[in-house]
Structures are given as structure tokens and as C-alpha cells.
Amino acid sequence: MKNLKFIKPFFVEEIDENPISGKFTIKPLERGYGITVGNALRRVLLSSLPGAAIVNVKIQGVEQEFTTIPGVYEDVMTIILNLKKIVFAVDDESDDFEEKLELIAKGPQRLTAASFELPAGVKIINPDHYITTLSDDVCFHMTVTIKKGIGYVGAKENKVHIENQVGVIAIDSLFTPVVNVSYQVEKKLGNKDELTIEITTNGALLAKEALATAASILVDHFNVLVELSQKPAHVEFVSESKKEAHNYVLDLEIEQLDLSVRLFNSLKRAGIDTVASLVKLSEKEVVKLKSLGRKSFQELKDKFLEYGLEFNDYLKEALHHSVEEDKDKH
């Protein structure tokens, strides 16, 4: 039986990125794979990326969360709610990372996340985040413990680590650095899928770092399944070489390129029906085509650039692969 071959995406474009979000386009994908890949990435991004968060808090003079503190505007429960929203970035690769942070202050004063004393390797992404306000002459001493984790961990689970510690209050922890993920799939050339995925983080890591980490997690899981069979044919079934990706594009008809009417008609009148016949022409020959002006020529070059290649590079490399294939056949 002949091995099936799937087109593997060979183009990832970072459309837009800022410190808390990014949009990426992945193409080409086999029909149906846009949803398959997009959904898998989304689930991993939202549930499985590691992060750092506060797991417990100790406030001097406080034994439990259902109380108030003289001279402190917020009650303990409100202070805890505010602490949960502080975003940490930790420069430590160890899974068992743990650090205690202290906040010592005297009123009158407005306390924010920036009021904490930070050790090396720990950064607060939202230092202006409000915690509480102290009135005149009030001394306030608070210690929090931050750890690394995945997803959401409730106070009940965090409490296991602080048994018999008087005055230490376990809190809920949201470790995941990804706030939101959305994706859409469009049908493109040759009935292939184009996946656009948009990621919003809490600022602890860049969107492209989140995407790469999620992809790595998926690969690690699938590698376990791949190892069940050592048959070379199985590997070939799921992979695609760059040469085959080029040949896929060469086989496309120009109707599938979504060109402007002017450019499409110019190519058709010149007897050019496929990408393969188009790349056989030099740039000078293309420019000389009837009714094809500078704007249309630039559109054509942009179409090649969509696949990460300059027109001349594409011409040389694609034709080289075609010639090599012909040699192999003979």
C-alpha cells in the first residue's frame, strides 16, 4: 500500500504581538487539520502552561481570614482577593521553586504589589496593582509564599503544605499565564486550511513563548505514541519534507491563488495556468506580460512571499527540486 502523505505547515506568521497578546497564522494545513490543531493548542494553552502565584499568606496579628485589622481599610478577605491578582514572572526552571516575600509598611500609606521586597529572579508584572490602604501610625507586616504550578489549585489543596502553621492562610492559586485563546480557520489554496490563533497572556510571558511551549507539550505527549511503533512508514505518514511542500505549491492552478482579476487575466492570456509554469519565467519575462503593470507584479511577488520566500529564491529552489525529482524517476 502506498504511504499517504500529508502537507505539513511550513509557514508561521506573527501578525501582531505586544507584551500581553499575539496573533499568529499557521499554513498550509490539510483539510480539517485547522480545527484539530487549533483546538489542541487552545486546550493546552489554557490548562497546561506553568506559572507562579501566591499559595499562602501570613499577616501579623491575624489568625484567620474572616476578620478585620484595625487601621487597615480592607478586611482580610478583600486583601486576599487582591493578592490573588498579582502576576509574577519567575526566572527559575526548577519545578520545586518556592520563595517567601515580605511586605513591611507603616501608615498612612497606600500599598500595592510594588510594596513587596523582591529577591533576585522574581518580578511582578503588575506592580501598580492595589492591595490595601493603611491609616495613621498603623504597622503592617505580611509574608506571602509563591510557588510554581499549573492551572488552578484551590485553597484546600494548598492547605496541605501548611498544616500546624499558626496564622498561615492558604489561598486559591491561578498559575496559568494564559488569559484567553481564540482561533479561526479559513479555507485557502487547494482546499487547505489556514489557522489563525490569537493568544492573550497575563504578561508573565510573551504570546509566542506560550504558543511554542504548548506545541512542545503536545509533541512530548505524541512522541510517546510514536514510540509504540518503530516503522519508518509511520513517521513518513505524519511528516512532510520541504521539497514536497514546494511541489504542492507548484501543482496549484492560478485560480487557487486568489489573485486580482487584472493579474489573473494577464496570466491566463499568457497561457500560464499553474504555479509551475509561472515560476519558469524570469522576473523580466513576467514584467513584460501584456496588461501586467507594477502593481500586479508586486501583488504576484507578495503572493510568493506569503510562503516565506522571495520570488527568485523560490524560482531557483523549486525548480531545483523538480529537476532532482525528474532525475530520481529516471
From Swiss-Prot:
It comes from the Bacteria. Its EC number is 2.7.7.6. One of its GO terms (biological process) is DNA-templated transcription. One of its GO terms (molecular function) is DNA-directed RNA polymerase activity. Residues 1-229 are annotated as: Alpha N-terminal domain (alpha-NTD). Residues 245-330 are annotated as: Alpha C-terminal domain (alpha-CTD). Keywords: DNA-directed RNA polymerase, Nucleotidyltransferase, Transcription, Transferase. It is an enzyme of class 2 (transferase). It catalyses: RNA(n) + a ribonucleoside 5'-triphosphate = RNA(n+1) + diphosphate. InterPro entries: DNA-dir_RNA_pol_insert, DNA-dir_RNA_pol_RpoA/D/Rpb3, DNA-dir_RpoA, RBP11-like, RNAP_asu_C, RNApol_insert_sf. GO terms for cellular component: cytoplasm; DNA-directed RNA polymerase complex. Signal peptide: none annotated. The N-terminal domain is essential for RNAP assembly and basal transcription, whereas the C-terminal domain is involved in interaction with transcriptional regulators and with upstream promoter elements. Homodimer. The RNAP catalytic core consists of 2 alpha, 1 beta, 1 beta' and 1 omega subunit. When a sigma factor is associated with the core the holoenzyme is formed, which can initiate transcription. DNA-dependent RNA polymerase catalyzes the transcription of DNA into RNA using the four ribonucleoside triphosphates as substrates. Belongs to the RNA polymerase alpha chain family. This is DNA-directed RNA polymerase subunit alpha.
